[in-house]
């Protein structure tokens, strides 16, 4: 990561921008105090690349052993009170057998630093050859239910609301005890988009940021009950979401028409994310330069 990142975040926050940092976590793990600098500058959330729980997965996907670095990055972010979202790339035959263990790591992390909002997202890498065993939403949901031993069930999940429902899935849970989750109301079709810009920014910031509000024993009053419940909802919510990106083998124009994750291109305007990253069979981008 660039050395002036804290300064960039600080300047952006002065203009009311919200920052979510996508990172492999190496610098966050190795440089003590760096997470704190980013937090002080105004960073809201770290989206941490987290492909599995063994070094073998990282050696295959990233070219080096990284599990200890991931653990250290999570620890440093938690100590700096930065919200954390775990973001794995799920590849068939590489780490699809570790989906449950990744979720378990997220839940265990909440137990150690329970005010951290943890999320889980799944992305499918693009292949130059037609994949024989592609990751699909039904397959991912089956893996989640099987590998969590029913802690999270297929029927818990809803499709996307703003985007095409075949593009993503999500569910939110409230932690109850060490290994019990209560499914929260499904919110398919609901979100922060159809409102003012200020309200949308506040929604995103509240959704992903670390919460520091707690009640000490004996501090509660009867009038605090609702506030305490709302704080618990924020502090102990565990969200699981996934997005299956399209490639040359399954590109669907109807899905692209509803895409709201776009790249701004000087030649092509607003290009849907999947189309922007689309390549031909020789690996040459069609829109991205």
Identify the role of each PLM range.
Residues 26, 94-96, 149-152, 239-243, ...:
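A short linear-motif detector with a strong N-terminal bias
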Residues 89, 275-276:
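Surface loops and adjacent helix of pleckstrin homology
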Residues 204-267, 275:
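Basic, glycine-rich polyanion-binding accessory segments appended to enzymes
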Residues 2-120, 124:
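Radical SAM/AdoMet-radical enzyme domain recognition
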Residues 79-234:
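Radical SAM enzyme [4Fe-4S]-AdoMet core and its adjacent flexible, acidic
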Residues 278-289:
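A short, polar/charged loop-to-alpha-helix boundary motif
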